[in-house]
C-alpha cells in the first residue's frame, strides 16, 4: 500500500516503480511486476537493470506475448551490457521457453564465453551444429564459437 502511495505521489520517479516491481516479483506476482517495470522503463529507457528485471518478470509470466517482449527487452539489455553473463542466461531462457532452441543454445554459449567456460561454449556450439535445418547465420556463429573455443 505504501509503495502505491509513493508511485501515485511521484509518478515520474522510476525508482519507485522499479522497487514496486521488485516487491511484486518477490511476491510471485510477475504480471503486476512487469507492469511496474514497464512504467519504470518508460521513465528510464536505458536502464539495463530495469530491462533485466522486466525480462525476468515476463519470463515468469510465461505467455507467448510475454516471452516475445522478454526476448526484445533482454536483447536490448544484452546489447548494452555484453559482458554480463546473467543477461545472456536470461535471454537464453526466454528464447528456450519460446521454443527458439538454437538461438537459446547460442545465447547460453555467449554466457559461457563471458564466464570463461570454453568447454561449455564449445558443447553448446556443437549442439547447434548437430541440428538439421539451422539457419546459416546461426550455423556460422556456432562454427565461430567452436573454432575459437573448441580446443
Residue ranges and their predicted role:
Residues 19, 53-54, 90, 107, ...:
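Canonical tetratricopeptide repeat
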Residues 6, 39-40, 76-77, 111, ...:
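Canonical positions in the second alpha-helix
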Residues 27, 61-64, 98-99, 115:
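Structural motif corresponding to the intra-repeat A-B loop/turn of tetratricopeptide repeats
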